[in-house]
């Protein structure tokens, strides 16, 4: 309700967003975003939103290995992954988007400058989307807890998670 009342607060994690918006409301909002009808009028998943969801989950899985048992770090990692495609989705510059959103400073720095561990992890996840496997070498060299096998497992789990959101679409409409 505080969002509806116009209160300005810093959202620091996905859990915090759930507390403020409510789990059901946040879930519906995310599903609406992920499964909006594309401009061509065809029903289906917006590929950029699906990629953003995949990035978020992969970042979260990597975070759990890089900084174990730190929920805040994992939540921030998820946010960085999800938000990393906002410029393409919204047609705006990242700096302009972040000026309008109350997010943690480390999230902003990762999204603007690839700073900190979140920035390194984002660089790694983006490298997995490149056709050149050599693109992984540089970011992997800075994340000693991550190897190619673990990264592959994270990518598989992240994609399965994002695809699972689409399968839940039908049941969300009847809730």
For each predicted feature, which ranges?
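Conserved alpha-helical "signature site"
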Residues: 1-175
């Amino acid at each position: 309700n505080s969002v509806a009342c116009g209160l300005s607060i810093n959202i620091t994690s996905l859990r915090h967003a759930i507390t403020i918006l409510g789990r059901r409301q946040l879930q519906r909002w995310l599903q609406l975003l992920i499964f909006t009808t594309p401009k061509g009028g065809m029903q289906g998943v917006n590929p950029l939103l699906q990629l953003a969801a995949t990035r978020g989950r992969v970042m979260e899985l990597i975070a759990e290995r890089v900084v174990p048992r730190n929920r805040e770090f994992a939540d921030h990692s998820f946010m960085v992954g999800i938000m990393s495609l906002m410029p393409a989705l919204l047609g705006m510059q990242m700096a302009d988007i972040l000026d309008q959103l109350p997010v943690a400073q480390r999230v902003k720095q990762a999204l603007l400058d690839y700073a900190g561990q979140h920035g390194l992890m984002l660089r790694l996840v983006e490298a997995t989307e490149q056709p050149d496997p050599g693109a992984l070498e540089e970011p992997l060299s800075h994340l000693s807890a991550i190897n190619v096998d673990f990264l592959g497992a994270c990518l598989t789990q992240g994609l399965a998670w994002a695809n699972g959101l689409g399968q839940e679409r039908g049941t969300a409409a009847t809730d």
